[in-house]
From Swiss-Prot:
GO biological process, one term: embryo development ending in birth or egg hatching
Gene: mab-21
Species of the source: Caenorhabditis briggsae
InterPro entries for the chain: Mab-21-like_nuc_Trfase (IPR046903), Mab-21_HhH/H2TH-like (IPR046906), MAB21L/cGLR (IPR024810)
One Pfam family named in its UniProt record: Mab-21_C
SMART domains in the cross-refs: Mab-21
Gene3D superfamilies cross-referenced by the UniProt entry: 1.10.1410.40, 3.30.460.90
Keywords: Developmental protein, Differentiation
Role summary: Acts in a cell autonomous fashion to specify the properties of the sensory ray and non-autonomously in the choice of hypodermal versus neuroblast cell fate.
Domain of life: Eukaryota
Family: Belongs to the mab-21 family.
Protein name: Protein male abnormal 21
Keyword Ribosomal protein: no
Length: 364
């Protein structure tokens, strides 16, 4: 697979035009089904609790703002909440990948739309809002309108719904933070690298991030430090999908799309720690190693695929994968050792075939 010749270009384009496009078409169809169901659920939720307003919208291109695709069978719908203004955003690095929303000095609790979810210390609790939202969704899904094809998964406190017994969608409450950049990511972009250029870096920072209410590695497992666990449960997890997507265009996005296809076919199993998000993270790191545009042209995409997969093998062997913007956050944290070891074997088998078989993409 390694090398720069017309055979590589042909294989890359054939794989992309056939398997990647087939995957995209299937995902697009699934997204429309998921979005329709989520909008119906949120309509009923809003009727019971007007503060949870449906923010899922379809664009002129047929895409849905607020839907994140984790795999062809796993999705996330982001519900953006209103009125964060009376809170200060505090990102001091105390809780990895998270920040807290603290009532501004001089502000009264009664000035907030979310008054009953504010802790005694003045923090807006992500856990309390999530608990309230989950209870309402549970009530909605028990009605005849939804009970035949929707089921609330209650294996944790996230609001996860099984649809048609085929798809899982997590509905996540979040605050949108445009135009600000988290302190935990202040090191980015790294000095001295030509990628991204100044204009792209500034656009990426202006995109901002989301503060989401979700379970994290600490709250999902028994933590001996109860106070730390409670603090993290009340904190909001930072998600930076918009900023990441701004950096991945052209050949970079094409590389990621091919990797997603390869993951679905060769690295997916129940409980796999290798998510599409980890692949996206490693592509971003690969961008820093290969800054020039020509390095992401079709003739070089074979090398980029191998490079990312070798990074993945290394991460799995070290049992650590640092978040691209928030390096203190380990994306493999708390993942079972046996699943990491199995993923390492599957990934190495895949990358070995890509390296030694000049026609690998034709058979994968």
């Amino acid at each position: 697979m390694l090398g720069h010749n017309q055979n590589v270009v042909y294989q890359v384009n054939t794989f992309y035009n056939e398997k990647v496009q087939q995957r995209k078409a299937r995902v697009t169809k699934n997204v429309h089904r998921i979005a329709k169901v989520v909008q119906e659920i949120l309509k009923e939720v809003e009727a019971q609790e007007p503060r949870f307003i449906n923010t899922l919208t379809e664009t002129s291109t047929g895409r849905f703002d607020g839907i994140v695709v984790h795999s062809p069978s796993e999705y996330e719908a982001v519900l953006y909440l209103n009125q964060m203004g009376v809170f200060n955003f505090v990102d001091d690095g105390t809780i990895q990948g998270c920040a807290v929303l603290k009532l501004s000095d001089g502000r009264k609790r009664s000035m907030s739309l979310w008054v009953e979810f504010i802790t005694a210390s003045g923090y807006l609790s992500a856990r309390k809002i999530r608990h309230r939202f989950q209870n309402i969704v549970a009530q909605v899904l028990q009605t005849p309108q939804f009970s035949e094809y929707c089921k609330l998964l209650q294996d944790n406190t996230d609001v996860r719904v099984r649809v048609d017994d085929k798809y899982t969608v997590q509905i996540t409450c979040a605050f949108r933070c445009n135009g600000i950049w988290p302190r935990s990511a202040s090191h980015w972009p790294l000095a001295g690298l030509p990628w991204p250029n100044t204009a792209l870096a500034n656009q990426t920072k202006a995109e901002g991030f989301d503060l989401t209410s979700r379970e994290t590695a600490i709250t999902q497992h028994n933590n001996p430090n109860k106070q730390a666990s409670t603090m993290e449960a009340d904190a909001w997890a930072m998600k930076m999908h918009g900023a990441e997507n701004m950096l991945l265009t052209g050949g970079r996005q094409k590389t990621l799309s091919i990797l997603k296809c390869l993951r679905d076919a060769h690295m997916d199993f129940p409980g796999t720690p290798v998510t599409n998000y980890i692949l996206k993270t490693l592509v971003l790191y690969e961008c820093e190693k290969h800054c020039s545009e020509y390095e992401w042209e079709d003739t070089n995409i074979g090398d980029r695929l191998v490079g990312v997969l070798l990074q993945l093998v290394s991460c799995l062997q070290c049992r650590r994968c640092a978040h691209y913007f928030l390096p203190s956050l380990d994306l493999l944290r708390a993942k079972p050792t046996h699943t990491i070891e199995h993923s390492a074997k599957l990934t190495w088998h895949l990358v070995r075939k890509l390296m030694i078989d000049p026609n690998a993409l034709q058979t994968l």
